[in-house]
């Protein structure tokens, strides 16, 4: 996309999520995703800036859930980031394996998460360790906007894909085409404001002006 993100954008992402995850030197992360995918920014800097260890997953292992499970066990991985599609391939292998995983956080992103697909995992491992966390966001907002831990009770809940609440330094608004808040029950567009926004798109000034609009609620914000 050519989104212009600063070091400060990434730094504040780690600060804004510190209370939820308590990442530190005790953690072992995987670099599962291509560095062309924004999820890798979270993996790279989330591990190294917090003093953790980063295990680079070879491409062939990332496409083989049996080998991936073996790597997770052998390396003592504690933080795993996955798209829901990739995790669905790993799930049955982990649930059937006698080996113990060291995971304490599994973080989902990149696409919509269907909670019902996690039933076998939650029934096998529970919802505490590892904690399963759904994070929602896009490149233009520095990877993540919201955070929501998934619980066993969500299997019986009404929300098929709960995304939670914004990170503490972000705000969200559901607006119509005139940037007015929509009433409850009326469809609208989700707008994000706060410290995570990119500067814009590289060399695309028209698109930047179209997508990054002044906030109608705070003149100092977009």
Question: Where on the chain are the PLM-derived regions?
Answer:
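Gly/Ser/Thr-rich phosphate-binding loop
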Residues: 49-52, 77-81, 91-162, 171
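Short aromatic/basic micro-patch
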Residues: 4, 38, 62, 81, ...
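AMP-dependent adenylate-forming
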Residues: 10, 129-134, 148-222
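Alpha-helix capping/helix-boundary segments
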Residues: 85-87, 113, 197
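Conserved AMP-binding
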Residues: 33-37, 60, 139, 194
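Conserved pre-ATP/AMP-binding loop-to-beta segment of ANL
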Residues: 23-29, 35, 168-170, 184
